[in-house]
A protein has these predicted regions:
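Extracellular/periplasmic catalytic domains that process cell-envelope and extracellular macromolecules
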Residues: 65, 73, 90, 112-117
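Short, low-complexity, Pro/Ser/Thr/Gly-rich segments in the mature regions of secreted, periplasmic
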Residues: 134-144
């Protein structure tokens, strides 16, 4: 399943790359977290965006959700992922892939609890013009 998600993300990214020559830059997603748009293409009412996200040791994404589905591949490091119940819903090591569903009912947090940068390749499939993420309040967890 993980290989299938990675193949889908890579295939979609290659298709998007073939369809566009523009390269956009993104701003950091939060304290210590950086993001760089590698490829962006709009088809119909959807934006397909391939982005590299780097999370330094001890940092995280902050609580958030997405307006569209995301497919991520862990290029480096280990990502610890938590849902709104404060439970870990996955620990993703280098070479792993994950899917994040859309909607405010899927609030989550990604953290780097390791000693090296986490580097993700993320394919965002968003409604046209939607932001990468929507900030959400801490759902009552003892960590941020």
């Amino acid at each position: 399943m993980r290989n299938m998600l990675r193949a889908a993300a890579v295939g979609a990214a290659c298709t998007a790359l073939a369809l566009t020559s523009a390269v956009a830059q993104a701003t950091p997603g939060g304290p210590g977290v950086t993001g760089k748009v590698l490829v962006q293409k709009t088809i119909g009412d959807r934006d397909y965006i391939l982005r590299q996200v780097t999370i330094p040791p001890g940092q995280g994404t902050g609580w958030h959700y997405h307006d569209g589905t995301l497919y991520a591949y862990v290029k480096q490091g280990t990502l610890s992922h938590f849902d709104a119940t404060c439970a870990s819903d996955g620990v993703y090591h280098q070479g792993s892939s994950l899917k994040e569903p859309s909607g405010a009912d899927h609030v989550h947090l990604g953290q780097n609890r390791g000693t090296t940068d986490v580097v993700l390749e993320v394919l965002y499939v968003l409604p046209h013009g939607a932001p990468f993420a929507e900030d959400a309040p801490n759902p009552g967890c003892s960590f941020q």
